[in-house]
Amino acid sequence: RSRFPDILKIEAQEPYAFQDAIRGEYPQYAKKVEQLPPQQAGGKLTPQGTVNNYQFISADSQWKVSLTKSFIALSTHGYTRWEEFAKRLDRILAAFIQAYQPAYFSRVGLRYINAFRKAELGLENAQWRELIQPGYLGLMGDDDAQEGAFLKNEQNITAAMPGGAKCNIKCGPGMLRKINNQTRQSQEEKVFMLDIDLFMEGNTPMNHAVPALNVVHGNAGSLFRGAITDTLHDAMEPRDA
């Protein structure tokens, strides 16, 4: 997600020119009116208004571009390689810059939400401390800890990273709900969530956005690899880039 100073034109009218530029890859369109979170003023929560979130979705529904008056984002359910994601993002940012000429980006970032499933990896009988490094497990990482006794065990970390980047990490065991597209029945599965939000703040010129994202991405790989054990790494059958 990349943030920029509010562009009122985006809120005031449908993004026709931007859609024309990316419609070949993202033919589906939806507009959502979202309620902004309340802000605290004078010790009281003050209700805020709404914001238009324009969404452009690929034909297979695996990729989505979100555009509001203050940010643009690309998300996917099927992330496999950085190179593909980066190429798509580069085309989207080029179309956005041409349509709206933003002054600069105030925040550029990448967010990776990982859900590790033991059964899917053939690790049903493994304990999380065999798969996740101790620093990401908290008390559950102790050798004598009973994994099933923990009702909640969430770690929240904010740290400075090389190259001027920062990260927010949220991790811990949880339940992931899966919905069968045919029957619409839902099923919950135990997973370990690793939510990594990497970003750079400050005024980033348009022509420096891609280099800034490369710095952010460069930190993502080391963070991810540092969070998992060799056992989990090998079970995921990583491919060479």
Q: What is the predicted function of each stretch?
A:
Residues 25, 88, 92-99, 216-219, ...:
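Conserved short hydrophobic interaction patches
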Residues 29-43, 98-113, 144-152, 223-241:
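Short glycine-rich, low-complexity/disordered patches
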Residues 60-100:
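Hydrophobic alpha-helical segments and helix pairs
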Residues 14, 18, 81-88, 92, ...:
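Short amphipathic alpha-helical segments
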Residues 1, 63-79, 105-113, 188-201:
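Glycine-rich, often proline-containing surface loops adjacent to acidic residues and nearby aromatics
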Residues 1-67, 202, 208, 238-241:
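N-terminal low-complexity, intrinsically disordered segments
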Residues 189-241:
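Long, compositionally biased interface segments
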Residues 51-57, 107-184:
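Aromatic/basic-lined ligand-recognition segments
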